[in-house]
Amino acid sequence: MEKINLCEGVVAQMMDTEAWGNVSGDFPFSEAQLEKYADKLDWKEVSGNTNIFWSVQMLEKFKRRIDWTALSCSLQEENVSAELLEKFKDNWNWEEISDNRCLTPELIDQFADYINWKALINNWSCCEKLATEEFIRKYSDRIPACDFKDSRLWREMVEKKEKEIKKQICLC
């Protein structure tokens, strides 16, 4: 059996790097802690960390370090505001934001030009609240017709219609 010759310094450095990566992904860092340990952190992991409450000030301070795609995927509903989306609208990955549960009807209205509509109509967490004829009428010019019938939104609307029909049958 071949022995691997690892010097202590290399092993310690590898362990340190991996441990910091793990901590980066789940520790609820404050702004001060992010600043203090900025050079040790794995910023892709930090960006995907759902235990960090990102303020506009924090995003501004760390915007060059943040992995915006990872943050767009992991953004929490309680963390999202129109101000936050507006301030960094050119940084967000809008396809990921459109597939995120953080979007409210008000945010959809405000950022309709940035939304990836194919992703939105397949967003499991949004479709139940969006599955209305009013929504379809309002955004008919934005919803991609070629993707609509195969979307989660379509299935949600058909399920609602099925329930209406069954209820109607039972009342007769």
What function would you assign to each model-found segment?
Residues M1-C172:
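Alpha-helical scaffold segments
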